[in-house]
């Protein structure tokens, strides 16, 4: 039977991609349905209890700038906050938070249940309803059918999921949850390229059985950062430390002696695992020269004894896992509460996606999260928000949108995936972006919030706060420009005391702030430049904008030059074989990838500048170039 109401957008899956997708569509005024096999696991942290990090924190800030949930939920659930790379330049500084799993999940659930235009329903989805190459709804496991204009699949590791512990394996979406077998089979019938990936998780440890006096404590930052641009430190629960221990030669001997019982090394697992989060057996074999590996001991929450030993993800048998854990300092008597395991699952080649996350072969069907070959909560959330937003735009009959590579790490993410695809779980790093200085954590709102407001993603409170911040930055920069100091000024001696070289000519506040020895805080403590009446977010922007203005302007010039043909559209059905001068290799690669734009085509391996020139000549000859391109 069909459900009595129709929906604009249906989201399948309630993880980090699904929750952001559903909330985005609902915020944009679309009647949205979120289907999940278990409402109690909405927003669950399936792996490590942490959000953010290098590149990942940038994505979280961008999701937040567009009105998303992840940063706010982290502020409410975060039990330790740190700024990574704090001594380096602003482009690579990143926020990372340990989270209380229960508090984080509760924060997500509360927002979902109170979001207008959003309905939650507990049922697994077994089938899609497709007519004339367009999705029009879904079928649940009990046969109930739902109609919608757009469907977003955010199914994580559940598609054909298989869990491995030693040489034993069984079907599962994650520990304790069933897999999506019927839906996986249905998707394999559609014209998508599909493959298998693998990820893993470590055994969880009972903190009561650990000798913390043998471990190195790692405390969070003080003052405590916030993740959301709307956040405040009073949102945070009690803060607690993490700990550090190390593997040793005994650990490594245990692993080497049991490789014949490893599903990875015995050929049972065929899926490729994450390069930047390898299992402990992988680390021991790949880095045989290392005598030890650092292990971060992360509390799972304030009201549980469970610990997450970040760095010993493993699929070795349980008896071997016990030996590995007890070989480490402080863990000689440790008890395991949950065994570690590996999981294999289906993913779909993201080159079969448009940059809006809509599939190229089935209209109205969007993919987001691990189904696209990514790894990580943050990557999933970013994809989910954009997919949900574009599904909503489609249901409104409007053109889709995604940020460019110079606008957001989100843009880098979808461009990398849809242009180059991936053979291993894709993780975001700052090194993947060409314009890192423009894509900082601190300016994510300045880059994206206005765009989010135009699409209906940003509410009135955030919009008012954003406009006040922009006004504060502009006013403070103007104030500094208007204050002039010369060698004969009354307080020049006070200023010269903190300068490496005394003032030799007239200078204003911004001139002084550009000096490497001067910080905004130091400058505004001087009599001529105090007091400063702006908050930390605005003052941080003033300092970065002034100190790095030359470099920022240079990157903006580079962007302007590269954009000339970046967004020039290529017809989906273009016959590349009739474009004169293209080699057979180039024709094959372009035909396979079906790039949407000249910019995407230029980033495909083996596509030369000469080939791009030939494409532009062809487009111009056939009247496909807009004026000025």
From Swiss-Prot:
Q: Does the keyword Nucleotide-binding apply?
A: no
Give GO terms: molecular function aspect only. flavin adenine dinucleotide binding
- The primary location reported for this protein is cytoplasm
A single cellular component GO annotation:
cytosol
Q: Does the keyword Flavoprotein apply?
A: yes
Give an example GO biological process: tRNA wobble uridine modification
Q: Which PROSITE patterns match?
A: GIDA_1 (PS01280), GIDA_2 (PS01281)
Family note: Belongs to the MnmG family.
Q: What does the record note on quaternary structure? A: Homodimer. Heterotetramer of two MnmE and two MnmG subunits.
What is the documented function of this protein? NAD-binding protein involved in the addition of a carboxymethylaminomethyl (cmnm) group at the wobble position (U34) of certain tRNAs, forming tRNA-cmnm(5)s(2)U34.
Name of the protein: tRNA uridine 5-carboxymethylaminomethyl modification enzyme MnmG
Give the source species. Answer: Photobacterium profundum (strain SS9)
